[in-house]
Amino acid sequence: MEVNVKGNYVQVYVMLPLDAVSVNNRFEKGDELRAQLRKLVEAGVDGVMVDVWWGLVEGKGPKAYDWSAYKQLFELVQKAGLKLQAIMSFHQCGGNVGDAVNIPIPQWVRDVGTRDPDIFYTDGHGTRNIEYLTLGVDNQPLFHGRSAVQMYADYMTSFRENMKEFLDAGVIVDIEVGLGPAGEMRYPSYPQSHGWSFPGIGEFICYDKYLQADFKAAAAAVGHPEWEFPNDAGQYNDTPERTQFFRDNGTYLTEKGRFFLAWYSNNLIKHGDRILDEANKVFLGYKVQLAIKISGIHWWYKVPSHAAELTAGYYNLHDRDGYRTIARMLKRHRASINFTCAEMRDSEQSSQAMSAPEELVQQVLSAGWREGLNVACENALPRYDPTAYNTILRNARPHGINQSGPPEHKLFGFTYLRLSNQLVEGQNYVNFKTFVDRMHANLPRDPYVDPMAPLPRSGPEISIEMILQAAKPKLQPFPFQEHTDLPVGPTGGMGGQAEGPTCGMGGQVKGPTGGMGGQAEDPTSGMGGELPATM
């Protein structure tokens, strides 16, 4: 029976602390981390996830890479017998409420921004966001002769060359490619550092000169050179109904509105496609999986305009699937989706935010599965209680355990936010160990489960028109059981979720979505809907 049940095994990873490598690019916490990894091994965890910060490794100058601290960290992980998910973190960590560390993008890159501030994403007020370079400079050779995409490709190439021993040994199994703020493929539409607070709709962030020029050219090409960016979409903390653009039957449904939203979201998809193509060339032939992070923007999901998703770049409506288009692009690169909110229940949310994390998770996971992708998830808040774990288990195997083989749909893996002493002590540790057992279908840890094949070359380039065919018709998600059939103990209680957001795809505070590598969720997400004044 065990052979048949083995197909139900879902791998479990744990995000390492943000300061696993210090802000001065040193590995200084070896003894502490060694003890924590020992506890993870005892719990049966399959591996760990770590941010590999661009701002640390290439901080001293163009191509002046220093991988020494990360090599020491990776050696420790290897000796523990754990696998490793490495995040190419091209974004800033820090600068928001709850951030434990501050790691900006390289100073020499920011220096280019003092001469040309349009290298940064810019809102309609002219405020620059220095977390991540605008996709408008993807192909602009502004950085000592290199474009942004070339810098990212060179960084990944240097990583491959310096970490070859860990790639060859099968220690590194996942390369998660950062594509935006918090490492997520999105625009920085809801920055707390610029005054956004949950559940604001956010703003369109495309006012740098490079994206403005691109839009003007695109509008002229369809015979509307007079079209400009929306001027009725409100401000960061508006609700949809306070704006002409997002209200019911608003501007977003007009020809001009649809054109803008398509341009805005298509640019994001093309940005991901460009960088994943480079990542594929870099890691071609290695036994790794490429992955990207998609942000879990669950607030205003229940209103027709899906306003907060639209400002982030996800063109998702009741009759248009904004996530399957992304999945269609990823299919070309055989890349996986990493999504968040896996522990959240609608019943835990504020009614005023019109939030629906369960429906959102089901839509995104279904989109990935329909495109034949491996799909992974994270929790958004560091929760330790059976209620959260059981929600994750339900999402991991929507139809429950299949006694006769692999389920039709299941997560490829789950990454827990985040490693801390609080996780590996007392009842929290007991609950976590039980959770890992349940994710493994009560089977022993298997380091050889889901073996990686050599990464093949990306498929032929797909036109944006072909990608957009995935948007319609918008199909219903696959059915999900209400409860897991393999629960962790008694349910009830919130059991210790974090108050307020913490850090991004390994490091930024970004409110309500969780990060690929580890930020926490907005405090209203799973805390009964209270909106603290600090937000």
From Swiss-Prot:
The active site is at E184 (proton donor), E378 (proton acceptor). Its EC number is 3.2.1.2. GO terms for biological process: polysaccharide catabolic process. Signal peptide: none annotated. Catalyzes the liberation of maltose from 1,4-alpha-D glucans. PANTHER family: BETA-AMYLASE, BETA-AMYLASE 1, CHLOROPLASTIC. Monomer. The keyword Metal-binding does not apply. The gene is BMY1. Coiled coil: none annotated. GO terms for molecular function: beta-amylase activity. It comes from Hordeum vulgare subsp. spontaneum (Wild barley). The three alleles show different thermostabilities and different affinities for soluble starch. It holds the Pfam family Glyco_hydro_14. This is Beta-amylase. Gene3D superfamilies: Glycosidases (3.20.20.80). Residues 489-532 are annotated as: 4 X 11 AA tandem repeats. Substrate binds at D51, H91, D99, K293, H298, T340, N379, A380, R418. Residues 513-535 are annotated as: Disordered. Belongs to the glycosyl hydrolase 14 family.
